[in-house]
Amino acid sequence: ATKTPSLNINLNNGFTWNLNSNASAQNADTTTALFDNLTLSSGAVLNGAFSDAGANNYIAKGNVASDAGIINLDNPSHAKYDDVLTIDGNYTGSNGAQVRMNTLWNAPGDENGADSTSDVLHITGTAGGNTIVSPINTSGTANIIDGNVQQVASVLNTIPVVIVDGDNAAGTFTGTAQTTGAAEVQLTSRGAGAGREYYWTMNAKPIIPVDPVDPPVDPVDPPIPPVIYNPSVPAYVEMPRANMELGYATLATLHERRGENQTLAWDECGTCGTDAKGQTWGRILGKHLEQDGKTRLNMTSNIYGIQIGHDFKIKRTDKGAHQLTGVYLSYGRSNTNFYDNYRAVNGIISDDKYTGKGISDSASLGLTHTRYAPNGSYLDLVAQLSYLHNKYQSRRGVDVGQNGFGAVLSAEVGRPYALNKHASNESGWMIEPQAQLIYQYVDLKGFNDGIRQVDQGSQSGLRGRVGVRVAHNAQSSGDDYQTNTFYGVANIWHDFLNPKAVSIGQDRVGEKYATTWAEIGLGVQRAVGKHSYVYADARYEHDLGKTKRDGYRGTIGIKHTWK
């Protein structure tokens, strides 16, 4: 018996086979390359877009295996979207196999691929393994789709760019592409007869449950699937909020920042404040805060800081009131992880919501002025100016930095009331209603991450609180007695302003957060010398609505009054 001859071709090490009018392996016709098996390995290229003149339409008749190989439909000018390569056989891809092509996608677009055109890979047999589809834009940059399509409140897809007639599993072909806006484009698929077709989408589909619902429910019109965001977008949108939380944590409340300074009126039988030359203080602080957005974006921040200050002027009046005026320097850092509830992989919403992280550093200068009345009432005024530096790191490896500044103004008042009668040198309880209003302004410099322009602009925050502090002041006997303080605190905080949307390319993206939350805490101050104290404060906060805000923070400090 006569054996049928076979032709098996192995290409490797970057070798390129250009399909053109004379490229037929067995010269069957001018557009067909005929073989039994073709293996592409180690960067070898099957080039189906050799010419810029007219549409390239070739047939590779046989089975193709791509082991880190490349099927190329990207023509030399990168500006033609009508090339077609048909593999008339079966196909497998492995080890980072690629398909490179040109795709154009303009607005407005629709679910069926209107306003899009593309090169196409058509496989008549089966397909297996995994192959990455990479769109090449007009400048030759990979993973960017040409055109001006942008996120809108409707489903947006392209025409199919890979068509498989035979059996193949979803995810055989995958890919992601950038836009110059907030959206990311992902390759997804749908059944088409006995096979499957792959297309680019801007919308994330939910995972379809495998088990049927029992009892069955009547069908309803599905909501519009959410837009797929680029992994950098949550950080770009939420970083101004993270910067503000760092500013608020640095300023804090009077008792977190300074402990109990009424001891100037109590210690040494009320004579401590009369000859005080100044007070030097320092503290370290830490905070963990988890915030969910009302729409889709969440973040978790860990804040650390150190603060050193000095009151260069302490003034005491004849009526027993005293005033402290001083400055402080602070360094703070915030490490923030960002999340997207609709993060998608291959066009399907993923269980892994993490999108990237950000690091914020701040250097702050503060000016303080605190006034205590003879009855213990106080007014605390603070102005704080901060230099900010942010560094963004998305899970895709995009690494970019920016600078900015922040300014904070705070006014806090309180009035203590004795809960039991006691002499000035006796222990006693008191209750102190408090209120505070903080205005913060953050301005971040715009930047370009290499794909899109990001402008967060200026953001303003107005945060207020009302609360109460219950304190026990224990005073030792003797001429030089010191005052040890223990207290509990409860507050209601409220944000009066919502963050503004951020411009990302031609898109604007915003997020809103919990506006009201409760806080409880404990604090202590102990004398460690005739004129020195250590103090500490720890607090827990939780939202009072349906949107999550959950966190805890603490500080420990030391202060010394100079005589």
Each language-model region and where it sits:
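Extracellular beta-strand/loop-rich repeat segments of large surface/secreted proteins
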Residues: A1-N157
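Intrinsic-disorder/low-complexity regions
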Residues: I9-N12, D36, L46, G62, ...
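Intrinsically disordered low-complexity regions specifically enriched for long asparagine
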Residues: D83, I87, D221-I228, V413, ...
